[in-house]
C-alpha cells in the first residue's frame, strides 16, 4: 500500500510554495534521486513518500526536466499498479497518470488532454453515479435551488440561466417545488430554463427530459439550449470566434439566442462553472455581464482549497498546486472509501471518469485557477457590484437533512461561514455554495 498523499497539516502545503525543495527535504531528496537518473531501486532506497514523488514530478516538470519527471511518475504508477487499490493507491494512480500525460504533452509525445481549465466531460452514467454515491453535487443543487426558490417567490414568470446545465438533474426538484407553491387561484408560474453547455446533443436531451417532467406536473415550461464555444466559456448560440474576457463581457443581445423579457424574474446559476474562466479580468468581465442582466439572485458553487489555496488569483507554482489538489482529492477519495462499498463499479466509474478527469484538469496548464475559493469568488462578486444574499436557515437545515438521510457517515460536515454554506469531510471544507444579488449602492 502506498503511503498517504494527504499532508500532515495545512502548513505542509504552504511549505511547497517554492517547489519540492522546500518540502522539509523529502520532496527535494526525491527530486534529486529521480533527477540523478538512478533506477527505481535507488530511488526506493531513499524512501520518499508517494506525496514526495508526486511533488518531485511536478517540480521537475516545472523546471523542464521531462525525462526525470516521467521517471518519477512511472515509479508511482508502478507502485500503484491500477486504480483499484485502497484510497491512497487510487489517488496516487490518478495524480501520477495526470502528471505523466502532461509530461508527454509537453514533450510532444501526446496530445493535450484538456482544453482551457475544464475537465473532459464524463459519461452520463458516471455523472449520474457521482450524483448518487457522493453528496457534493446534490448538496450544491439543493442549496442553490433553495436560494433560487426564495428569490423568485411570487413571480409569475421565472427565467433560470444555468451556465453548466449538463444533464439537468438540478432542476426537477426546483420545478416541483415551484409547482407546489403556486397560488391555486392563479395557477403555477411560467418557468423558462436557458441551459448552457458545450455539447448540443446533450443539451437537446436535457431539454426533452425537463419538458416531459414539467408536463407531468402541469407546469408551463420552456427550455432553450445555449452552446458554449469549446474555445471559451462565454455564451454563444453557436460556437463562434469570440474568446476570453471580451466575449464574457459582451451584452446579452450579442449572445445570440440568449433572450430576456422585462417581466421575468431572472436567476443565474453558476454551479461548478466559474473556475473555467481564465483569470481575474475574465472573471470580473463575466460577473459584470451577469450584473447587467439585473438578476434577482446568482448562485455560485465551487471547490474549496481548504486554506491551502492562498490569496492569489491562480496557483501558478505547479508543486504547490499539486499539493493543494492532493489534499482536496485525498479527502474526497477518503469520503468515498468510507461511504461506498469496496469493489463498487459505480465508485470506479466515478473515480475514473469524473474525479480522474478533474485531477487531469487541475494539474493541467490552466488548472491553477481551480483553487480560488470563496474569498476570491466573493471578492470578485463584490467588485462587480454584487452583495451577498445570506442563505436562509431552512436552506442550511435542508443541506444537513440531505446528509442525514442519504449520506449518514459521521465524516461529512455542513458549516456556515462568510455568508456561504460549506460541505466538508472531517475538518476539510471541499465545496462552498453562496448566493448573491445586485447591491443597492
UniProtKB/Swiss-Prot annotation:
Where found in the cell? Nucleus
Q: Does the keyword DNA-binding apply?
A: no
Region of interest (Leucine repeat I (LRI)), ranges: 48-126
Positions with biased composition (Gly residues): 21-33
In chain numbering, motif VHIID lies across 158-162
Record region (PFYRE): 266-361
Q: Where is this region: Disordered?
A: 1-33
Q: What is its main location?
A: nucleus
InterPro entries reported for this sequence:
TF_GRAS
A single Gene Ontology MF term assigned here is:
sequence-specific DNA binding
Which top-rank group of organisms is this from?
Answer: Eukaryota
Renumbered residue ranges of the record's region VHIID:
127-195
What this chain does, per the entry, is described as: Putative transcription regulator that controls rice tillering by initiating axillary buds and promoting their outgrowth. Rice tiller is a specialized grain-bearing branch that is formed on the unelongated basal internode and grows independently of the mother stem (culm) by means of its own adventitious roots.
Q: What protein family is recorded?
A: Belongs to the GRAS family.
Name-wise, this protein is: Protein MONOCULM 1
Q: What is the organism field in this record?
A: Oryza sativa subsp. japonica
Amino acid at each position: 500500500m502506498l503511503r498517504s498523499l494527504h499532508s500532515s497539516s495545512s502548513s505542509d502545503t504552504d511549505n511547497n510554495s517554492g517547489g519540492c525543495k522546500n518540502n522539509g527535504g523529502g520532496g527535494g531528496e526525491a527530486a534529486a534521486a529521480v533527477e540523478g537518473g538512478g533506477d527505481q531501486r535507488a530511488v526506493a532506497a531513499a524512501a520518499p513518500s508517494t506525496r514526495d514523488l508526486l511533488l518531485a514530478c511536478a517540480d521537475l516538470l516545472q523546471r523542464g526536466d521531462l525525462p526525470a519527471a516521467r521517471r518519477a511518475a512511472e515509479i508511482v504508477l508502478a507502485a500503484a499498479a491500477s486504480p483499484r487499490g485502497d484510497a491512497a493507491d487510487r489517488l496516487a494512480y490518478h495524480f501520477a497518470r495526470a502528471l505523466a500525460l502532461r509530461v508527454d504533452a509537453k514533450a510532444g509525445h501526446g496530445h493535450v488532454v484538456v482544453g482551457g481549465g475544464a475537465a473532459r466531460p464524463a459519461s452520463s452514467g458516471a455523472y449520474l453515479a457521482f450524483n448518487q454515491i457522493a453528496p457534493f453535487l446534490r448538496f450544491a443543487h439543493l442549496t442553490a435551488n433553495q436560494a433560487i426558490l426564495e428569490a423568485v417567490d411570487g413571480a409569475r414568470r421565472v427565467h433560470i440561466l444555468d451556465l453548466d446545465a449538463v444533464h439537468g438533474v438540478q432542476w426537477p426538484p426546483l420545478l416541483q417545488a415551484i409547482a407546489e407553491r403556486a397560488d391555486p387561484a392563479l395557477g403555477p408560474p411560467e418557468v423558462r430554463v436557458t441551459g448552457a453547455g458545450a455539447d448540443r446533443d446533450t443539451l437537446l436531451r436535457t431539454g426533452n427530459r425537463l419538458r416531459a417532467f414539467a408536463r407531468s406536473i402541469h407546469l408551463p415550461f420552456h427550455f432553450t439550449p445555449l452552446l458554449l464555444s469549446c474555445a471559451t466559456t462565454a455564451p454563444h448560440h453557436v460556437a463562434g470566434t469570440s474568446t476570453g474576457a471580451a466575449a464574457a463581457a459582451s451584452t446579452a443581445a450579442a449572445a445570440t439566442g440568449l433572450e430576456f423579457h422585462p417581466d421575468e424574474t431572472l436567476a443565474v446559476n453558476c454551479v461548478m462553472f466559474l473556475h473555467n474562466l481564465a483569470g481575474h479580468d475574465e472573471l470580473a468581465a463575466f460577473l459584470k455581464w451577469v450584473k447587467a442582466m439585473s438578476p434577482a439572485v446568482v448562485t455560485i458553487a465551487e471547490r474549496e482549497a481548504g486554506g491551502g489555496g492562498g490569496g492569489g488569483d491562480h496557483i501558478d507554482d505547479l508543486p504547490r498546486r499539486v499539493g493543494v489538489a492532493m489534499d482536496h482529492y485525498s479527502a474526497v477519495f477518503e469520503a468515498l472509501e468510507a461511504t461506498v462499498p469496496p469493489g463498487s463499479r459505480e465508485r470506479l466509474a466515478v473515480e475514473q471518469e469524473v474525479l480522474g478527469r478533474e485531477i487531469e484538469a487541475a494539474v493541467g496548464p490552466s488548472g491553477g485557477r481551480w483553487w480560488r475559493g470563496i474569498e476570491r469568488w466573493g471578492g470578485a462578486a463584490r467588485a462587480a457590484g454584487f452583495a451577498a444574499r445570506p442563505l436562509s436557515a431552512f436552506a442550511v437545515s435542508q443541506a444537513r437533512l440531505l446528509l442525514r438521510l442519504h449520506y449518514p457517515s459521521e465524516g461529512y460536515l455542513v458549516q456556515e461561514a462568510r455568508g456561504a454554506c460549506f460541505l466538508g469531510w472531517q475538518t476539510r471544507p471541499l465545496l462552498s455554495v453562496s448566493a448573491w444579488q445586485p447591491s443597492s449602492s
